[in-house]
Regions:
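Active-site residues of response regulator receiver
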Residues: 79
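Short hydrophobic/Thr-rich beta-strand motif most characteristic of the beta2 strand and flanking loop
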Residues: 50-61, 65-66, 127
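Conserved acidic carboxylate
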Residues: 33
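Acidic catalytic/metal-coordinating carboxylates
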Residues: 58-61, 83-90
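Charged docking surfaces used in two-component/phosphorelay signaling
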Residues: 40-48
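Alpha4 helix (beta4-alpha4-beta5 surface) of REC/receiver domains from two-component response regulators
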Residues: 14, 88-89, 93-129, 133-142
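Alpha2 helix of the CheY-like receiver
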Residues: 39, 60-67, 92, 137
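Disordered, acidic interdomain junction associated with two-component signaling
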Residues: 1-30, 117
Length: 152
C-alpha cells in the first residue's frame, strides 16, 4: 500500500502566501487535481498571472470539460494519482484531440510509485508536492515556452 507524501493543506498554504515573480501568459491551462483545496490554490496562483484556467477534480471530469471546451488547451497540469482515471490515462486520451498540448505532472507520491504509472522525471515534466508558488509558476512557464514537439 502506497500513501501520498502528504494530503494535508499546509503544502498549498505556501502557494497563497508567497510572492510570485514568474512571467505569466494568456495560455489555456487545464488543472486536474482531486484535492479541492490544492486545485483551488493552483488555479488561483496561475489565474493571477493571466492564464485562462479550466479545472477538474477527476479524470472523467477533465474529459467532460474538454469535450465541451471550444478552444485549444495549451497545457495540462495533472496529478498522477487520481480516483478513477489516473493522470497518465487522462493525458493519453486528451492528446488524441490536442496533439500539441504540453504536459506537467504533479504528485505527492515518491518516485517508485510514480514510475508504476509510466512517469519518469527524466523523461517528462514532473513537479513533486509540496511545491512553492514560485516553483509552480516557473515550471509552468518553462513547459509552455518549450518549442513544439520538445521531449525531455
Amino acid at each position: 500500500v502506497f500513501l501520498p507524501v502528504s494530503r494535508k493543506s499546509p503544502e498549498a498554504v505556501s502557494l497563497k502566501s508567497e510572492k510570485v515573480t514568474a512571467r505569466g501568459g494568456s495560455e489555456v491551462i487545464l488543472v486536474v487535481e482531486d484535492n479541492r483545496y490544492v486545485l483551488d490554490l493552483i488555479t488561483e496562483v496561475l489565474g493571477s498571472l493571466g492564464y485562462t484556467l479550466l479545472k477538474a477534480r477527476s479524470g472523467e471530469e477533465a474529459m467532460d470539460i474538454c469535450a465541451s471546451h471550444t478552444g485549444g488547451i495549451d497545457l495540462v497540469v495533472a496529478d498522477v494519482v487520481l480516483p478513477g482515471m489516473d493522470g497518465p490515462a487522462v493525458v493519453k486520451n486528451l492528446l488524441k484531440d490536442y496533439p500539441g498540448m504540453k504536459i506537467l505532472y504533479i504528485t505527492g507520491y515518491p518516485g517508485e510509485v510514480v514510475s508504476l504509472y509510466g512517469i519518469s522525471d527524466t523523461e517528462m515534466h514532473l513537479l513533486q508536492k509540496p511545491f512553492s508558488a514560485s516553483a509552480l509558476t516557473e515550471k509552468v512557464r518553462e513547459v509552455l515556452d518549450e518549442p513544439p514537439g520538445h521531449v525531455l
